[in-house]
Amino acid sequence: MSEPTSRRPAYARLLDRAVRILAVRDHSEQELRRKLSAPVMGKNGPEEIDATADDYERVIAWFHEHHYLDDERFVMRFIASRSRKGYGPARIRQELNQKGISRESTEKAMRECEIDWSEMAREQAVRKYGEPLPSNFSEKVKVQRFLLYRGYLMDDIQQIWRNFAD
């Protein structure tokens, strides 16, 4: 018979919890640390794992060693995922920063991803406002505001009207 979770060592419970977390999607190291240290809902309400800092470090090291936790892979997949959803480089950088990814790692991955951000900005504008894109000033401002919110840079937005003039 399996022993109750309260009697299992904290390290084993942390390892199980980390496996469940990483089975859903890739996470950054900082995200995994945050989720592991947060209380988990049990049958009788929130339960905390009484683990030591060493237990957390051992779990993180185990996942790095077995290549289940890799910030570089996470960043590349995150950029691909968010860009497919129509978000621009500024927003993606901000989200990666919130997930604890260093600026250097983010910039390296952004250079390697080879995404044409001005073309993506145009696709988003056409999807939202239709073809041809508006040419009067007030409508252009609406398009710019929408694309800035989505995380595109002003240079990429201005390229839409320079490169793709109707």
Swiss-Prot record:
Residues in the signal sequence: none
Gene3D superfamilies on file: Winged helix-like DNA-binding domain superfamily/Winged helix DNA-binding domain
Protein function: Modulates RecA activity.
Hydrolase recorded as keyword: no
Coiled coil: none
Family (UniProt): Belongs to the RecX family.
Biological processes, Gene Ontology terms: regulation of DNA repair
Annotated InterPro entries: RecX_HTH_1st (IPR053926), RecX_HTH_2nd (IPR053924), RecX_HTH_3rd (IPR053925), Regulatory_RecX (IPR003783), WH-like_DNA-bd_sf (IPR036388)
One term under GO cellular component: cytoplasm
Keyword list, A-Z: Cytoplasm
Pfam families, sorted: RecX_HTH1, RecX_HTH2, RecX_HTH3
Name of protein: Regulatory protein RecX
Organism of provenance: Salmonella paratyphi A (strain AKU_12601)
Chief localization: cytoplasm
Record localization: Cytoplasm
